[in-house]
Amino acid sequence: MPGGCSRGPAAGDGRLRLARLALVLLGWVSSSSPTSSASSFSSSAPFLASAVSAQPPLPDQCPALCECSEAARTVKCVNRNLTEVPTDLPAYVRNLFLTGNQLAVLPAGAFARRPPLAELAALNLSGSRLDEVRAGAFEHLPSLRQLDLSHNPLADLSPFAFSGSNASVSAPSPLVELILNHIVPPEDERQNRSFEGMVVAALLAGRALQGLRRLELASNHFLYLPRDVLAQLPSLRHLDLSNNSLVSLTYVSFRNLTHLESLHLEDNALKVLHNGTLAELQGLPHIRVFLDNNPWVCDCHMADMVTWLKETEVVQGKDRLTCAYPEKMRNRVLLELNSADLDCDPILPPSLQTSYVFLGIVLALIGAIFLLVLYLNRKGIKKWMHNIRDACRDHMEGYHYRYEINADPRLTNLSSNSDV
């Protein structure tokens, strides 16, 4: 039945049968002893009623709005607009799906139950509009190995979300897979702090995730990875950083990730991989690297990477890698380039660059002073311009007068006679 509960063999049915059997026996005893039947029933009935009513919640009951399968050890509460984690989850649950809800906040001890959810191994909370995960939210889940928080706008992820409310005394987390794809919140909800830093703090707190084998951080608009972030995750086998905005891996060290098998760096903003990164990747024995759809800049700085690509086998689909810049190299396949193709525009020595910068500053100051002088003397300059204009006008009028006399012979003779 949609949205209903599909339960396995119910322990509650057994208890109900026992209660009915007790009532039948009580009735038989009452009928065999009529004088004491009324008093026996009146004294025993309250006890039986209280015994039945005092039974604790059945450990295999299915929460409202959820679907349960004891055989598969699975509970699904999907797209039910739940605002909190159900409190009556069955103790047998091993796989719990709480996707597509309206949880908003995951408080400390959100999954603490009596009896505890000791078998819960896989927890999926994706797409539940979580914007805050508090310290100790996943405490009391000793078997939790896979956690999916994808597609939640996590504006506030506590540093102790995965390590417990007190990382200094908490045991290592049992998590093996942590999926945090597309958890970046809107810009106006980031509380004026680095989103990358918030996520990394949660990953590294108390060194609780040293057993983590799979980490997915795709589609989070990461611009960089903080220094040594991966050094404290030595058990990683699969790392997904695809579809971010990473421009460089200069400060990221892969040296300690000796078990790393796959590294996804597709769809980032990488321009070149430098020698240090190339050497570390080449030193990992089982690594497969994915580098598709990055804007590679094919200039003289790309020479070492091109040489490495031609020799290594760790890069998957390396024949698909193409240049994005400069314009003359666009869509050229990296494996087809040689050293003659990779050149850089001449670069001025640093000392000469400094001289030109200083000269530009001096000229700018001189120009500013000149404009200030002109502004302060604007009235005098205006008067001087009027005088120049009047002088030019008088000069031109005299010129036109002489020209008219010279052009008319009668005026010329008249002028000569008047001179005589």
From Swiss-Prot:
CC annotations in GO: axon terminus; cell surface; dendrite; endoplasmic reticulum; plasma membrane
Subcellular location: Cell membrane
Residues annotated as transmembrane: 356-376
Residue stretches making up the LRRCT domain: 283-346
Gene Ontology biological process terms in this record: cell adhesion; cell chemotaxis; dendrite arborization; mesenchymal cell migration; negative regulation of canonical Wnt signaling pathway; negative regulation of cell population proliferation; olfactory learning; positive regulation of chemotaxis
Cross-referenced Pfam families: LRR_8 (PF13855), LRRCT (PF01463), LRRNT (PF01462)
Ribosomal protein is among the record's keywords: no
Tissue expr: Expressed by all types of trophoblasts as early as 9 weeks of development. Specific for trophoblastic cells except for amniotic epithelium. In adult tissues, the expression is limited to a few epithelial cell types but is found on a variety of carcinoma.
Signal peptide: 1-31
Residue positions with a glycan: N81, N124, N275
Keyword set includes Transmembrane: yes
Membrane topology category: Single-pass type I membrane protein
Renumbered ranges of LRR repeats: 92-113, 116-139, 141-163, 172-204, 209-232, 233-255, 256-275
Spans within the Cytoplasmic topological domain: 377-420
Cysteines paired by S-S bonds: C62-C68, C66-C77, C298-C323, C300-C344
Location of Phosphoserine modifications: S418
Keyword tags: Cell membrane, Disulfide bond, Glycoprotein, Leucine-rich repeat, Membrane, Phosphoprotein, Repeat, Signal, Transmembrane, Transmembrane helix
InterPro entries: Cys-rich_flank_reg_C, Leu-rich_rpt, Leu-rich_rpt_typical-subtyp, LRR_dom_sf, LRRNT, Wnt_signaling_inhibitor
Other remarks on this protein: Antigen 5T4 is overexpressed by a wide spectrum of cancers, including colorectal, ovarian and gastric, but with a limited normal tissue expression. Could be used for tumor immunotherapy. Reduction of TPBG levels by siRNA significantly enhanced the beta-catenin/TCF transcription-based reporter pBAR activation in response to Wnt stimulation.
Function: May function as an inhibitor of Wnt/beta-catenin signaling by indirectly interacting with LRP6 and blocking Wnt3a-dependent LRP6 internalization.
Protein name, UniProt field: Trophoblast glycoprotein
Organism: Homo sapiens (Human)
